[in-house]
Every structure is written in structure tokens, then in C-alpha cells.
Amino acid sequence: MHRIITLISGLSLASLAMAAPPENPVPTGQPQALQAYVTGYSYWDNTPPSTVEISHPVRHRFAGGMGTFSNPVTMAIGHQIIAGEDILDIPAGTLFYLPRLRKYAIIEDTCGDGPSPQDGPCHIGKKGLIWLDIYVDGVSADKVVSDTCMSAITGVQPVVMDPGPNMSVVVGPVTEGGCFIFPDP
């Protein structure tokens, strides 16, 4: 569910609280190329840990997916809790394509914990960009292997919101599938 995010060293809570969130792209049904800060989360560091629970199921009941158009990988997005309502930065069910991973992903989970996730890095973003947190799996892999994969995929990279169905894919979970990373298109 709500994923625990470790604050990046050097950032203070005060600077996070004062930072303005990025202007989030709006799904239109037409492909939109954009840059995003992409991170990964796994079975091992999900909230609660060692589970596959997700907060906003759309295509899956639990975190997972094979990265195809018809079975995209679960992805988390920042969110806000306002007057007790959980508001995602981008609507659940929004589809993305990540060219560096050659995976389709779908918003089905939230990134950020606590009573005010809007004060955390997932909602605030990174370098003025939206923060996308893809589920790298790890159920069948050692924690060190999934952590290494998460570290390898972390960074600013191109993504496509509302992609078409004919993108090149590497089928399988991110970690267990080899954690392949391709050059930017």
C-alpha cells in the first residue's frame, strides 16, 4: 500500500515541505512523451513489507504484471490526503510505457506514507518532474537482487503516458526478468 520512502540525504524536511509539487500531466488518451523521475519498489520494501498489497487495484488485485500492454506492471504515484480523501497525482488506471525498461506500467498504487504524503518526495517530485515508482517484484528473488535492480533503474528518464499497444517489450517481472535497462530512445 503506502510505500515507505527513505528521504534522500541532504534534503531537510523543511525544504520538502516548502517545495512545490510538479505540474502533473493530465491523461488525454493520446500518447504524451515526457520526462519522469523513475524509482522502483519491491515485495521487500512495500508497505506493509513482504507483501504485494496495492492501494488502487485496476487490472491486478495485487502488485505484479508482465510489462505488456494487456498485463502492465503495477506502478505507484504520489498522492495527497485532503479532508480524509486519498487523491492520486495521476488517476488510477493511467497507462505508461517506460522505454528504458521496455515495459508498460499502470497506476495502481500510492507512493508515500503517513498522514500527510503530500509533504513527501513522491508527491513533491524530483527536479521538477513527476515521480513514478514501478513495482520491480522480487518475490522470487533475494532482497539484495531486487535492491540492486531498484538502484539501477532509478533516475530521470523518458516515459510515454497513454501509449499505444505496439511498443517493444521485454516480457516478465522487472527483477526476475533480468532487470534489463536499455539506452534512451
Residue spans of the language-model regions?
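Solvent-exposed, well-ordered loop and adjacent helix/strand elements within mature globular domains
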Residues: 24-185
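Fungal secretory targeting signals
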Residues: 1-22
